[in-house]
Swiss-Prot record:
Similarity comment text for this entry: Belongs to the GHMP kinase family. Mevalonate kinase subfamily.
Pathway it works in: Isoprenoid biosynthesis; isopentenyl diphosphate biosynthesis via mevalonate pathway; isopentenyl diphosphate from (R)-mevalonate: step 1/3
Keyword Kinase annotated: yes
Name of the molecule in the record: Mevalonate kinase
Localisation per UniProt entry: Cytoplasm
Organism expressing this protein natively: Pyrococcus abyssi (strain GE5 / Orsay)
Length: 335
């Protein structure tokens, strides 16, 4: 049995189809190469101990025993991550039918609350690290299902997109609860974070209100978004060369952003980052996720640095990254 395991899992972006997916339309999501790292090892206390050094918020150390939670420090949003980690560890211990002290230490490149799936990534990386520590053989699909279960326990509702993308990696086409893996395309992207986040629940409710008040206007927008996702899928699986794929996907990104703007989920800051990216040479740029803040992303072959600079000048936090073919990764095992 190993004495220490280090695992990592990637963030995700919704490439196409946010909001319309709520109405039964498809969406395409992908893993991106921003990662959360979880180190797991045994401890002698018999408790679960979580150290969160860097979740893009100040660190904290928390110990759980059967009936008490010990907070050594307490800083804002970092605390939100703890429920995911605790449930992830407990599910693995339950699956392995073991009760032992486990310490996990978390470091992350993924900002919390930015719509990039930070909660799913930490849950998946924790399940991967702790299951390996306990010599429990789980497939990536099984880990994705456990990650989905963690989200249900913490959030009460979840489509399962985030943990599935984080565990398995690459591109995922999602429609009404069913997943389909798409061929891998290397997309050079830049993610821009506005520094604030909107409430997914409130934004979904706002779109629902508009849909109920003006179905004759909103239904065609949602219908167009669904068709756009299927068009993007066609491009991804086509035999077109890389440059042609980029051009077509970029055009679809720009249309998708316009449709999301028409639904009312973009913000002044998101649009500023989107247009700054396009002006700097991005082929396409759009918001990703619920909107109301959070992130946008730009497709910028050969122009990632220029686009990142433009996003920074426009007041955003740029992250140069790429689509991650790999999902969950075991980085290190010490016997």
């Amino acid at each position: 049995m190993p004495r220490l395991v280090l695992a990592s899992a990637p963030a995700k972006i919704i490439l196409f189809g946010e909001h319309s997916v709520v109405y039964g339309k498809p969406a395409i999501a992908s893993a991106i190469d921003l990662r959360t790292y979880v180190r797991a090892e045994f401890n002698d206390s018999g408790n679960i101990k979580i150290e969160a050094h860097d979740i893009k918020t100040p660190g904290l150390i928390v110990s759980f025993s059967e009936d008490k939670i010990y907070f050594e420090t307490d800083y804002g949003k970092a605390a939100e991550v703890l429920s995911y980690v605790r449930h992830a560890i407990e599910l693995v211990l339950e699956e392995a039918d073991k009760r032992t002290g486990v310490s996990v230490s978390i470091t992350s490149q993924i900002p919390v609350g930015a719509g990039l799936g930070s909660s799913a990534a930490v849950a998946v990386a924790t399940i991967g690290a702790v299951s390996k520590l306990l010599d429990l053989e789980l497939s990536k699909e099984e880990i994705a299902k456990m990650g989905h279960k963690v989200e249900l326990l913490v959030q009460g509702a979840s489509s399962g997109i985030d943990p599935t993308v984080s565990a398995i990696g690459g591109f995922l086409y999602y429609k009404q609860g069913e997943f389909e893996h798409l061929p891998f395309v290397e997309l050079p992207i830049v993610v821009g974070y506005t520094g604030s986040s909107g409430s997914t629940k409130e934004l979904v409710a706002m779109v629902r209100r508009r849909y109920e008040e003006m179905p004759e206007l909103i239904e065609p927008i949602l219908e167009s978004m669904g068709k756009l996702v299927d068009k993007a899928k066609e491009v991804i699986i086509s035999k077109l060369d890389e440059e042609e794929k980029f051009l077509k996907l970029g055009e679809l990104m720009n249309i998708n952003h316009g449709l999301l703007d028409a639904l009312g989920v973009s913000t002044k800051k998101l649009s500023e980052l989107v247009y700054a990216a396009r002006t700097a040479g991005a082929i396409g740029a759009k918001l990703t996720g619920a909107g109301g803040g959070g992130c946008m992303y730009a497709l910028a072959p050969g122009k990632q640095r220029e686009v990142a600079t433009a996003i920074k000048i426009a007041g955003g936090t740029p992250m140069i990254t790429r689509i991650s073919k790999e999902g969950l990764r075991i980085e290190e095992v010490r016997e």
